């Protein structure tokens, strides 16, 4: 029987506010077994960029990463946000190790080609070194992964945290029974976005497509669910979308084939 592993992705809103960060650290530390944490940090990057006089440009909710912005996100994601989380977990007895994709070549990416939009120094994941992560995990290390990768040519690349979580979970599913948890500001996928208790407990691909056609699921939840189904089809055992405060309670929406 294969060992179980939980990959948890948390957004910047959770890790950038003291109260929600403290709860996350406590809840994550309480999760037993092997685990990996992937975090965002976009709001902090926008704030620091503004303080440095650098304008943040967004298209369809995604950051345009020019050379100056790349310096900011590298500092903020790989430094400020990541090390705050690592220090907090160490204080709770979790042997956390902060990583970007460049560290030990754990995630290699390719710079996104220019199509309708030039996103700049943004990376699309090519390879995750699952054996390296597994070696760390078996030594009792808990990887804490920032949303940064590299191209192997000396360039850092800004990379979507949802994508890093999904690609990491898929790669590790060759070695573990992986549960991928996307933490969100809602209790799960909702039938009615104005009713926080209208959680859909389970959702299949066919049901998802029908919900999209009916307008029940829309906006940013669509790519999140697309990533979830892709992970399931690639061998991830289970995908859950839930509140960050519910990660230890086994609640939320479960994604089924």
Curated annotation (Swiss-Prot):
It is an enzyme of class 2 (transferase). One of its GO terms (cellular component) is cytoplasm. It catalyses: N-acetyl-L-glutamate + ATP = N-acetyl-L-glutamyl 5-phosphate + ADP. The record marks 9, 224 as: Transition state stabilizer. The keyword Transferase applies. Pfam families: AA_kinase. InterPro entries: AceGlu_kinase-like_sf, AcgluKinase_fam, ArgB, Asp/Glu/Uridylate_kinase. Pathway: Amino-acid biosynthesis; L-arginine biosynthesis; N(2)-acetyl-L-ornithine from L-glutamate: step 2/4. Its EC number is 2.7.2.8. Keywords: Amino-acid biosynthesis, Arginine biosynthesis, ATP-binding, Cytoplasm, Kinase, Nucleotide-binding, Transferase. Belongs to the acetylglutamate kinase family. ArgB subfamily. This is Acetylglutamate kinase. It comes from Bacteroides thetaiotaomicron (strain ATCC 29148 / DSM 2079 / JCM 5827 / CCUG 10774 / NCTC 10582 / VPI-5482 / E50).
């Amino acid at each position: 029987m294969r060992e179980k592993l939980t990959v948890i992705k948390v957004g910047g809103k959770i890790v950038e506010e003291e109260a929600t960060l403290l709860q996350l650290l406590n809840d994550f530390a309480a999760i037993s077994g092997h685990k990996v944490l992937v975090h965002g940090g976009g709001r902090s990057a926008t704030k620091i960029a503004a303080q440095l006089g650098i304008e943040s440009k967004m298209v369809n909710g995604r950051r345009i990463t020019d050379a100056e912005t790349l310096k900011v996100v590298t500092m903020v994601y790989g430094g400020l946000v990541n090390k705050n989380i690592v220090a907090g977990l160490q204080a709770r007895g979790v042997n956390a190790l902060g990583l970007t994709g460049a560290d030990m070549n754990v995630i290699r990416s390719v710079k996104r080609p220019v199509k309708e939009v030039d996103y700049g120094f943004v990376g699309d994941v090519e390879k995750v070194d699952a054996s390296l992560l597994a070696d760390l995990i078996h030594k009792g290390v808990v990887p804490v992964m920032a949303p940064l990768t590299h191209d192997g040519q000396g360039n850092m690349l800004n990379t979507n945290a949802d994508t890093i979580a999904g690609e990491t979970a898929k790669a590790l599913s060759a070695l573990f029974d992986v549960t991928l948890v996307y933490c969100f500001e809602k209790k799960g996928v909702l039938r009615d976005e104005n009713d926080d208790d209208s959680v859909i407990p389970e959702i299949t691909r066919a049901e998802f497509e029908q919900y999209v056609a009916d307008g029940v699921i829309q906006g940013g939840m669509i790519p999140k669910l697309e990533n979830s189904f892709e992970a399931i089809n690639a061998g991830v055992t289970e995908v859950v979308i839930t509140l960050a405060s519910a990660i230890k309670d086994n609640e939320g929406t479960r994604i089924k084939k």
